[in-house]
Amino acid sequence: MRTITGNLFAIGLLFSTAMAITGCSTVDDGSYTAPITLSEKISGKWVVNSVMQTDEANARTKTLTDLLDFDTFVINLNQDEAGNPSTFTVEGSAPMLLPTSGTWKMDYNFTKSDNTPSRLLLNDGKAETALTVTAVPGNTKTLEYRLTRKTNGQPFVSYTYNLTQAVK
């Protein structure tokens, strides 16, 4: 009985030692890399694919892309040397629904866990314009955001811009 107990103890001790030695592996997982932010994905020069106007009262839509020179719309979302949002400019002869220049930032720089859309905030020094981001660039270089106009807190019209990143 002693021999069996002694042998089992020795096997258990040997197994525990082997596990402790192999468990102390120093595999290099690489250096820390910061996660990709929405600002990184959204920054750059964007040209219009389409602009849709939606009447929020009755959900009617109208394509404005070929009307009122919306096909000339370009927005440049610039970053500073550190990769942070900095300035923006709007070019083209489309109606000025957005400020033409100023600074930009995201309300939250990552995908929100509660699935609410992120907002792109444009500030021209006088007022801040909030754009609801409805599509973020990924495999396809497409950015989509919506500008919603309200009266007395109720939305009455929105403009959805579908943009493609310009070739650098």
For each feature predicted by the language model, list its residue ranges.
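Bacterial N-terminal signal peptides that target proteins for export
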Residues: 1-11
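Core hydrophobic alpha-helical transmembrane segments of single-pass membrane proteins
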Residues: 13-16
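C-terminal motif of bacterial Sec signal peptides marking the signal peptidase cleavage site
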Residues: 19-23
